[in-house]
Amino acid sequence: MSEVITQEYTEDGKVLRRIRSFVRREGRLTKGQEAAMKECWPTMGIDYQPELLDWQQVFGNDNPVVLEIGFGMGASLVEMAKNAPEKNFLGIEVHSPGVGACLASAREAGVTNLRVMCHDAVEVFAHMIPDNSLHTLQLFFPDPWHKKRHHKRRIVQLEFAEMVRQKLIIGSGVFHMATDWENYAEHMVEVMNQAPGFANLATDGDYIPRPDERPLTKFEQRGHRLGHGVWDIKYQRTA
């Protein structure tokens, strides 16, 4: 896949059009990333195939599954997996050097509760993630597509929210988003408030303080020093 595709639907559920969400960015792997891919992929990598995953088979236990879309270089995902051995983590990233870097970090940290995929997240969701099975879905700092004419390319749209809803555990599953673009934060809230079957978990306004489980990234620390804001948003599946 060269790009992530989302679909726009008519009211009766027919596909109206398919929209690019973000373009896959291929790059050269460093020798270290390439070595990590070769060494760690057999135990931590999951190849795309159009059949549902069995979490017990994937992780060897029935611990709650946290899925992250677009983990970048994987530093915070590995840290989360290390800090929460009682949970299982699956990261999906289309940028292969990022996957290599994540595997190298995971190997160094000695985590065993992390699996990764290098594929289009929407396609993985459609064909591999069982309904009603995710404890948490994480979407941290997705491409904001800040130009207004590109807003339709943002991954958080109504059809994406519905796909997420189907995969989260009913009554407890949480969709956790974070962005450093205020306009995208507003867009996320607007979309999620329209999406059926979700409730905002914020107790004051639309946003929550950064939860302890989401590590502070270097990028975010720099943003704080420059006075930039970060917005965390959590919605729970209710129906």
Swiss-Prot record:
Its EC number is 2.1.1.33. The keyword Transferase applies. Keywords: Methyltransferase, S-adenosyl-L-methionine, Transferase, tRNA processing. The active site is at D143. It catalyses: guanosine(46) in tRNA + S-adenosyl-L-methionine = N(7)-methylguanosine(46) in tRNA + S-adenosyl-L-homocysteine. One of its GO terms (molecular function) is tRNA (guanine(46)-N7)-methyltransferase activity. Substrate binds at K147, D180, T217, K218, F219, E220. The keyword Methyltransferase applies. It comes from the Bacteria. Pathway: tRNA modification; N(7)-methylguanine-tRNA biosynthesis. S-adenosyl-L-methionine binds at E68, E93, D120, D143. Pfam families: Methyltransf_4. InterPro entries: SAM-dependent_MTases_sf, tRNA_(Gua-N-7)_MeTrfase_Trmb, tRNA_methyltr_TrmB_bact. Gene3D superfamilies: Vaccinia Virus protein VP39 (3.40.50.150). PROSITE patterns: SAM_MT_TRMB. One of its GO terms (cellular component) is tRNA methyltransferase complex. Catalyzes the formation of N(7)-methylguanine at position 46 (m7G46) in tRNA. NCBIfam families: tRNA (guanosine(46)-N7)-methyltransferase TrmB (TIGR00091). Belongs to the class I-like SAM-binding methyltransferase superfamily. TrmB family. This is tRNA (guanine-N(7)-)-methyltransferase. It comes from Vibrio cholerae serotype O1 (strain ATCC 39541 / Classical Ogawa 395 / O395).
